Amino acid sequence: TPREAGGMGLAAQWDDDVHHALHALLTGERQGYYSDFGSLDCLAAVLTGAFYHAGTWSSFRGRRHGRTVDRARMPGHRFVAFLQNHDQIGNRAVGDRLSASLSPRMLRVGATLLLTAPFTPMLFMGEEWAASTPWQYFTSHPEPELAAAVSAGRRREFAAHGWSTDDVPDPQAPSTFENSKLDWDEVKASPHREMLATYRELIRLRKTVPDLSDPRLSRVEVWHGDRHVAMRRGGC
């Protein structure tokens, strides 16, 4: 928000609500902070207004949260949106990416919604080819007490999300870091090659179709039924 409107004058803001809406809808997960997300109504709200919680009740927080974005004044490019990032993947019990649980078809649905939305899209490393390698939380703390505290804290958080802690990798183990490295050779193989082509085409469309780079939230319209959603950007 601009300083003259009472904000901090930042260039852009991380938009977790877009991630939560897409993730919960695509995966069906409803635990933890996904509890209020996952419906097409929720998806429509974030695509047109950036946030779902706009002074509404957050069951995860146990209180009202957020405030309404002024769609006429605030451009969409000031919101950084994503399907995956280092936090959302690294803070899962085993660091599994969306590609571990979603079909290529559903991954393309998510990519299309992200890259045709009015926000600044951010891609996580390897997302563009549906990398099969995990992104596991790893550390190199020299203090044994800190390392143990971090590991114990993560296990408590995973238990609260309903995830099994039996297979949680040790953040301090070198193998946890090694497991998180990308396998660049798989880019050449199917289905990774085809997924990369999909992302490239979506990025090309975003760069060449003027309405897809129009930042005005007031020119975004979304309709949906029980099993479909449609988004209109300007004249598109």
What name fits each language-model region?
Residues 49-66, 123-138, 152, 160-235:
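Glycan-recognition and catalytic regions of carbohydrate-active enzymes
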Residues 1-163:
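Conserved alpha/beta catalytic core and glycan-binding cleft of carbohydrate-active enzymes
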